[in-house]
Swiss-Prot record:
Gene from which the chain derives: rplU
UniProt entry tagged with the keyword Ribonucleoprotein: yes
Subunit relationships: Part of the 50S ribosomal subunit. Contacts protein L20.
Keywords: Ribonucleoprotein, Ribosomal protein, RNA-binding, rRNA-binding
Source taxon at top rank: Bacteria
Family: Belongs to the bacterial ribosomal protein bL21 family.
PANTHER family: 50S RIBOSOMAL PROTEIN L21, LARGE RIBOSOMAL SUBUNIT PROTEIN BL21M
Pfam families: Ribosomal_L21p
One GO CC annotation: cytoplasm
One GO MF term: structural constituent of ribosome
Protein name: Large ribosomal subunit protein bL21
Length: 104
């Protein structure tokens, strides 16, 4: 089984062909093709190769499925006896992609 580890938006993802991954928003239309070139490691036919920092000539081809927003996460801070509190919400914008091909 071949897999790859790539970096996108400050995070690292381990994927195989056919996986569906939520990435940071990329402003792409559905069915658009995306190339992810910051590949840190690739395993093909049992042979593992690491990059310094990226693997030369390696890329991951993916197809955009859709874009959306995640569930709301609420942060709440309260300081006792001061009637001081803060409530803040955050929703992550994401792009859902399907990994179609790992090129090494």
């Amino acid at each position: 089984m071949s897999y790859a580890i790539f970096k996108h938006g400050g995070k690292q993802y381990k994927v195989v062909e056919g996986d569906i991954v939520l990435l940071d928003k990329m402003n792409k239309e559905p069915k658009a093709l995306v190339e992810l070139v910051e590949v840190l490691a690739v395993s093909k036919e049992g042979k593992l190769s690491f990059g310094k920092p990226f693997v030369n000539g390696a890329k991951i081809e993916a197809e955009v499925i859709n874009e959306g927003r995640g569930k709301k996460v609420i942060t709440f801070k309260k300081r006792r006896r001061k009637d001081s509190k803060t409530k803040r919400g955050f929703r992550r914008d994401f792009t859902r992609v399907r990994i179609t091909k790992i090129v090494a």
